[in-house]
């Protein structure tokens, strides 16, 4: 480890150096995937003739927005879809997911959640939580069924096959959300898709791809998914895109989603890009390398805190399929100190002390450490957690590995300063 200019205890520095050396093999795999995915993105830029004109925006209706339409093509090729809908008007990943669900589902259709209960923020959209009559899927006559994971770990393929019969959508959440189940590899997503389609050839496999883009060499569309959804302030925005989301997959499904986002009959043909095209293109171009930095930060953090005596999910030596790591910190005091330490290692608002609050869409208080250039950007180093057992911090991001590593060490130092670590 190179010289550290922060006031980190020598014992912590020694442990961090050991942890980093033990991560070298994982780092090599991450770099190899980043090189492959970087070439894949570059080829999409070249094949779709991205020009300087594509970097400019439009106003008003946005008719003939060359940059907007080219971005759709670049995303579609790189992610393996027929078409894509990439828009800065998606306010977050949940909005993009909601648009896709409402775009594809109709009254009387059944949504089958194949990986247990989805994110907290989707519960009210579906209608399994919140007030009746608020405009949820269930309010509009959509039925909801759920297949829980076996022992909260593995998909229940037999139950998926049974319930897929008659369902319109097989919904898969790639990342773990605020749970401790493993995130799903692209291979496992493919097995779920195969199982659902064998039971019901007409079923639409929809994947919440948030936090997973460019972690592996393949994306879910290459293994049987029909449509994937994500956020531009996570992986594919590369730390540059300031807002937005995407929907990518089968052209007919993307068009339905576009009609939902704008209006029926206009779809993708309208929607000005303002000055967002350059940020979205540059961010997507950089995304594979930014994801690699976030993955290295995650692997290092897990190994470092394992050496400090904490359990991590995934463990430091396990193959990644998203950028999230869970560090089980055992109690509220440890959890809050960790998040406050991450904040102290942030480039923006490092002097701010995060506290738990009642965050919209969640049923318990949440603490968030996110001193980011883009508010809520999960590709930048951040940590958040609901204040409830098992008091796990969900760590993600780090657009440069050296600063991500420093942030993790400062989190440990904050715990040490408060007498919460024994070294």
Indicate where each model-derived feature is located.
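Conserved C-terminal alpha-helix-loop-beta "cap" of PLP-dependent enzymes
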Residues: 306-422
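Short beta-strand to alpha-helix junction loop
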Residues: 63-67
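Conserved PLP-enzyme active-site core in the AAT-like
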Residues: 4-24, 31, 41-54, 62, ...
């Amino acid at each position: 480890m190179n010289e550290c200019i922060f006031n980190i205890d020598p014992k912590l520095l020694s442990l961090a150096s050991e942890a980093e050396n033990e991560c070298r093999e994982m780092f090599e795999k991450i770099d190899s995937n980043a090189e492959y995915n970087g070439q894949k993105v570059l080829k999409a830029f070249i094949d779709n003739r991205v020009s300087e004109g594509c970097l400019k925006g439009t106003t008003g209706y946005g008719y003939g927005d060359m940059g907007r339409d080219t971005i759709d093509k670049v995303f579609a090729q790189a992610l393996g879809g027929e078409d894509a809908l990439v828009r800065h008007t998606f306010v977050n990943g949940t909005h993009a997911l909601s648009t896709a669900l409402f775009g594809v589902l109709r009254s009387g259709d059944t949504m089958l959640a194949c990986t247990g209960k989805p994110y907290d923020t989707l519960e009210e959209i579906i209608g399994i939580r919140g007030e009746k009559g608020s405009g949820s899927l269930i309010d509009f006559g959509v039925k909801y069924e759920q297949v829980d994971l076996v022992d909260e770990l593995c998909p229940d393929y037999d139950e998926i096959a049974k319930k897929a019969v008659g369902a319109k959508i097989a919904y898969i959440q790639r990342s773990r959300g605020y749970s401790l189940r493993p995130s799903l590899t692209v291979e496992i997503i493919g097995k779920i898709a195969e199982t659902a389609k064998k039971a019901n050839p007409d079923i639409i496999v929809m994947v919440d791809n948030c936090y997973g883009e460019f972690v592996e060499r393949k994306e879910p569309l290459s293994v049987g998914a029909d449509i994937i959804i994500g956020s531009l302030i996570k992986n594919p925005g590369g730390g540059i895109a300031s807002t937005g989301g995407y929907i990518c997959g089968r052209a007919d499904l993307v068009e339905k989603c576009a009609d939902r986002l704008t209006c029926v009959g206009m779809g993708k043909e309208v929607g000005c890009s303002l000055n967002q095209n350059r940020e979205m293109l540059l961010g997507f171009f950089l995304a594979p390398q930014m994801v690699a930095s976030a993955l290295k930060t995650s692997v290092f953090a897990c190994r470092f805190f394992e050496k400090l005596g904490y359990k991590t999910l995934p463990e430091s030596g396990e193959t990644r399929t998203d950028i999230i790591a869970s560090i089980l910190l055992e109690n509220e005091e440890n959890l809050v100190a960790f998040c406050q330490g991450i904040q102290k290692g942030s480039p923006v608002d490092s002097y701010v002390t995060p506290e738990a609050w009642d965050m919209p869409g969640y049923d318990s208080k949440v603490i968030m450490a996110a001193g980011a250039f883009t508010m809520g950007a999960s590709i930048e180093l951040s940590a958040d957690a609901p204040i409830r057992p098992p008091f796990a911090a969900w760590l993600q991001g780090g657009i440069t590995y050296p600063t991500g590593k420093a942030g993790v060490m400062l989190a440990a130092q904050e715990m040490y300063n408060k007498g919460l670590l024994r070294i």
